[in-house]
Amino acid sequence: MPKAMEGSSMFIVRTAILGIIISTIINAYLMTLPLPVLRKRDYMANYLIKRNNRIDIQNKRECAAFSTAYVLRHFGMEADGEELYTNFPNKMSSGNVYPKGIRRVLRKKGFKTNYYKGNLNTLKYEVSKGTPVIVFIKVHKDRNNLHFVPVVGYDKEYFYLSESLRHLVNCNDDNNSYNRKVPINEFKELWNVKNINMLLYSNTYITVHTIQS
């Protein structure tokens, strides 16, 4: 390879690497870095959070607020996703919200949150504790539109979600715990949100806990 072409190729590679590094730093500031957790723990083979709740349907890009409101109602606090979204922090110009925004709102309400990067086993373990877990997934597996939604149960075939996007609702539950079930293999594809600008955010989720007094 001529030296001029070799130099040009190296410049392109270095520029690409620098772009990835800068993007990762910006995302770490705007979104916070998820904490890796891979340790396998015991959990029930099937689990569903059976608590009467209300599943509201969003109209625009308010999934972060609607997911947060669902979790707040789980803890007995009346919350409306649309109202919550009005003053929701960490919004992008598009109206979408960074994960940090969800955590800020929940902490302000008196809860402890963690942002994890795990796998199917760690997600099931967290759900089996009895509190909805907010996952960061794609709306459709072949597109890059991203979405927050609470996971409220699982079994050997499906994950059960409290879905705020009307066109994704595909079932119903007597307790209003869930209105969407996703086959596990499909969920894995939706959960893989990784792209060149977001290398660290596949398989991430937010857990919520009450603060012990």
Locate the predicted segments by residue.
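N-terminal Lys/Arg-rich, disordered targeting/topogenic segments
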Residues: 1-8
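Noncatalytic regulatory segments and standalone regulatory/sensor domains
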Residues: 13-14, 28-35, 92, 128, ...
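Short, exposed beta-strand "edge-strand" segments with a Pro/Gly-rich flavor and a Y/T-containing core
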Residues: 73-79, 91-99, 111-118, 174-182
